[in-house]
Curated annotation (Swiss-Prot):
Protein name, UniProt field: Large ribosomal subunit protein uL2
Keywords: Ribonucleoprotein, Ribosomal protein, RNA-binding, rRNA-binding
A cellular component term, taken from the record's GO annotations: large ribosomal subunit
Molecular function GO labels: rRNA binding; structural constituent of ribosome; transferase activity
Domain of life of the organism encoding this protein: Bacteria
InterPro entries registered for this protein in UniProt: NA-bd_OB-fold, Rib_uL2_dom2, Ribosomal_uL2, Ribosomal_uL2_bac/org-type, Ribosomal_uL2_C, Ribosomal_uL2_CS, Ribosomal_uL2_dom3, Ribosomal_uL2_RNA-bd_dom
Function of the protein: One of the primary rRNA binding proteins. Required for association of the 30S and 50S subunits to form the 70S ribosome, for tRNA binding and peptide bond formation. It has been suggested to have peptidyltransferase activity; this is somewhat controversial. Makes several contacts with the 16S rRNA in the 70S ribosome.
GO biological process, one term: cytoplasmic translation
Chain spans, region Disordered: 219-276
Quaternary assembly: Part of the 50S ribosomal subunit. Forms a bridge to the 30S subunit in the 70S ribosome.
Family the UniProt entry places it in: Belongs to the universal ribosomal protein uL2 family.
Amino acid sequence: MAIKKYNPTTNGRRNMTTNDFAEITTDRPEKSLLAPLKKKAGRNNQGKITVRHQGGGHKRQYRIIDFKRNKDGIPGRVATIEYDPNRSANIALINYVDGEKRYILAPKNLEVGMEVMSGPEADIKIGNALPLMNIPVGTVVHNIELKPGRGGQLVRSAGTSAQVLGKEGKYVLVRLTSGEVRLVLATCRATVGQVGNESHELIKIGKAGRSRWLGKRPTVRGSVMNPVDHPHGGGEGRAPIGRKSPMSPWGKPTLGFKTRKKNKASDKFIVRRRKK
């Protein structure tokens, strides 16, 4: 999908870019696959802010996505490629021959009219989902399961992909987008291909108001807060941090400090750590 640039008719448009949405084939989603989505504004069930910088934004409806890809042996045809406001990737509506309709993540180069299939016997074609044990070494995949039957959890963002590196017993070696090499159960499923809409990362928001349309509230620097609000706060004028390293609002070291738990159970599945 190409990036659309604008003439600098206003300061907000000067550096603004958008998708040209050339791949999108319809603006009317499938009603049977929509669900209501209530805004949380970053609050938990007590009304306390647990995620900062969230709130407002345009009203959305949730699109029910088939991450499990468990409709084995039944071919389906791509009916539409659609925009999804809840994720960076586009989605594809699949019409199966038994009459059922499902949304899947739209891989790169998937087009209307193409056929997709799930199951161990599926061909190695873009959009097909099958167990990792049946996918040849070197194949690019996405939407990878961590537990069989739970549904894809890894590599779902726009433009991302992973690669099958090898097979070791009941596990398969997979290199993720971050560079991390990880062992995944061979019975877990993945979808062949790279996630589409790879130009998403090149979009420039351009103005503050557009961030608000997306439900993103302003991020205030800690150095301009009071000491009660942030470890960087206080002082006369533009005071330095006054600490060994930058801190999070909760007093933890940040900017390079590793936050992963030391003895996490899944450490034994990580063959090589991700790149910085």
